[in-house]
Amino acid sequence: MSEENSLDVYSFEKENREYFERNLPPRPANYFGLEGFKEITRELLTEQTNRDVYMHLIRDSQGMMVGRINLSVLENDRTTAELGYRIGENVTNLGYAGEAVKLVLDKAFTTYGLNKIIAGTATGNLASQRVLIKNGFTFSRMIENDLHIHNEWVHTAVFEIRRP
């Protein structure tokens, strides 16, 4: 991600806000105001410069943004990162998530010097779990009552993969 393509991210997040909030905790309110988004983006780009996070956009063959994928390096273990990704509602089940995870894992282990990647999904998010398993992740543990979404507590299934 860069400042130049941050408006693509802003549009993508706004267009898919309701879809994402069905299964994920909502973003802060200021995230969807342009000035708030710009401020958050500046902070994220600083984190990226400091190698605290690696952010990538997922684009289709025509260059349209269809998703995003991030690696957030853990503060207490700089060789481990948490994987997160979002695919737009209109392009789910087309293979973008699987391919993006495959590509970012390669970068994580060969370019970024990471040794372990962890990823959490809501226990009901079977599609995301399939993407992780197809890319070599294994189930690690369950975190009960981890996320509060729509006034309900949701359990998280945690997966991990280590450098080959």
Positions of the model-derived regions?
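Acyl-donor (CoA/ACP) binding surface of acyl/acetyltransferases
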Residues: M1-D8, F12-R22, M55-P164
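Conserved GNAT-fold acetyl-CoA-binding loop/helix
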Residues: E21-R42
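A short helix-loop-beta-strand connector motif used in the catalytic cores of GNAT acetyltransferases and
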Residues: A29-N30, R42-H56
